[in-house]
């Protein structure tokens, strides 16, 4: 039997759900902007002893530039124009296809960036755990999808507190009778008799989490139906473990898997397992296959059932450089625009110890093991007059990174082309590179720092 609509969602028409997204509390946002960061710090100006701390608000007011050489390097920066573009491109794509966008917070863990995505029209925020969910709340999210199982008692207690907030939509995943019963037993101890909305997670054989076969799926659905404090509002999956590129055979495997997800959802619906909303929720979709998800799991009428599709793409906002990760539906310009690389990493040439080799002051500690190759994009030569007007020039194809140590990069170049003190601007091939940085400046196209974001990965 269907119950009340999901909290935190207002219905504007029979065919569309819209978010009820509250803005971040002004006091919390003010605290974030006024928080003082100890200097010296990467990306902040060197203040020659005038102060030992600086806030993001002060940094934005000062507007130093990378060109002036007053900013401590290495520094990761966000291109402001790319940020606005990428948010707009994905939101337009979601709106055109009638899907609800819940960008994954794990990509940036930056409340200020999440708030911009919400302001642009995102339905809510996807997270991996309750810590990330709390960061999403700081961003002002009033619809939060925890794309994971939650089994720890402290975590469940936090969820119980959140479900008492009528303004917040909170959904979690369940993939087994065991995970359902852990939630139910903890909820049973709560005194208010509340309930938690859950999505049954489906998964492929050999994949990650998720119920694999009909027996496991049915057993999990029955366990949720038998629970007094759980309501099954839909299904969820992550198709990204089925394939890892956009070759034709990979896309065929993705399509086949998504067709199975749809058929399984319809079977559960016909069995009367869903409860908690007038419309079924189906959730999937990282950035790489979001177009396939929308085609195979298109929202609307599935037989006699109305379905809303929530896509959880995250890496679109920090779209990377290089061909290795550009195999997304947004690589070529289309009707919704084209994603553009967001992040640049700037560092100085520390040494030219032999012809054709320069050592740059950036390494694995700055980009992480997972960030993959860094790609030389720009060279800012060290001029005779450090205060003269200069602009970065495009890096030659002859500049390549041959290796990374913890704090050093090996830059191959034509002898005589690179000098000690030159600054190099790198692109990052993998978009998940913010986790090594507590504060990341935002720069305009002239590399003037106009703002900064704080990250909360831990």
Predicted regions: what is each one?
Residues 23, 354-458:
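C-terminal accessory subdomain/extension
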Residues 9-161, 453-458:
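A charged N-terminal "starter" segment
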Residues 83, 106, 136, 200, ...:
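Conserved, mostly hydrophobic/aromatic
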Residues 188, 197, 204-332:
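Active-site loop/helix belt of alpha/beta enzymes
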Residues 290-383:
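Active-site loop ensemble at the mouth of alpha/beta enzyme cores that anchors a bound cofactor
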Residues 68-80, 143-146, 164-171, 246-255, ...:
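Glycine-rich tight-turn/loop motif centered on a GG-T
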Residues 102-247:
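Active-site-proximal beta-alpha core segment in soluble small-molecule metabolic enzymes
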């Amino acid at each position: 039997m269907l119950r009340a609509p999901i909290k935190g969602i207002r219905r504007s028409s029979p065919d569309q759900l819209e978010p009820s997204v509250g803005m971040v509390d002004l006091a919390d946002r003010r605290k974030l902007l006024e928080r003082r960061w100890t200097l010296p710090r990467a990306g902040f100006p060197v203040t020659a002893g005038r102060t030992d701390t600086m806030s993001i608000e002060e940094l934005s007011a000062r507007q130093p530039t990378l060109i002036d050489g007053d900013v401590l390097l290495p520094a990761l920066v966000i291109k402001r124009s790319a940020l606005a573009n990428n948010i707009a491109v994905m939101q337009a794509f979601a709106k055109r296809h009638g899907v609800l966008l819940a960008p994954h917070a794990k990509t940036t863990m930056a409340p200020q960036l999440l708030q911009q995505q919400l302001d642009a029209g995102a339905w809510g925020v996807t997270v991996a755990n309750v810590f990330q969910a709390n960061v999403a709340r700081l961003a002002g999210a009033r619809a939060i999808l925890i794309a994971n199982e939650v089994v720890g008692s402290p975590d469940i207690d936090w969820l119980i507190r959140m479900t008492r907030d009528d303004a917040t939509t909170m959904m979690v995943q369940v993939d087994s009778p065991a995970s359902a019963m852990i939630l139910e037993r903890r909820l049973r101890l709560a005194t208010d008799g509340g309930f938690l909305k859950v999505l049954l997670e489906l998964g492929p054989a050999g994949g990650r989490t998720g119920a694999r076969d009909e027996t496991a799926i049915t057993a999990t659905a029955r366990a949720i139906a038998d629970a007094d404090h759980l309501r099954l509002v839909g299904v969820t999956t992550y198709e990204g473990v089925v394939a890892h590129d956009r070759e034709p055979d990979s896309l065929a495997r993705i399509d086949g898997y998504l067709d199975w997800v749809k058929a399984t959802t319809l079977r559960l619906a016909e069995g009367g397992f869903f409860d908690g909303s007038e419309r079924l929720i189906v959730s999937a979709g990282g950035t790489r296959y979001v177009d396939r998800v929308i085609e195979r799991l298109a929202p609307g009428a599935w037989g006699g059932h109305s379905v809303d599709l929530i896509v959880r793409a995250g890496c679109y906002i920090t779209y990377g450089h290089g061909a290795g990760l550009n195999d997304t539906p947004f690589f070529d310009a289309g009707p919704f625009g084209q994603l553009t690389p967001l992040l640049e990493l700037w560092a100085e040439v520390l040494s030219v110890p032999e012809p054709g080799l320069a050592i740059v002051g950036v390494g694995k500690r700055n980009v992480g093991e997972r960030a993959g190759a860094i790609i030389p994009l720009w060279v800012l030569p060290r001029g005779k007059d450090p205060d003269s007007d200069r602009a970065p020039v495009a890096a030659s194809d002859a500049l390549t990174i041959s290796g990374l140590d913890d704090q050093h990069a090996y830059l191959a170049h034509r002898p005589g082309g690179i000098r000690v003190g030159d600054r190099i601007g790198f692109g990052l091939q993998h978009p998940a590179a913010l986790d090594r940085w507590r504060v990341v400046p935002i720069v305009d196209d002239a590399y003037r720092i106009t703002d900064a974001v704080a990250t909360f990965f831990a």
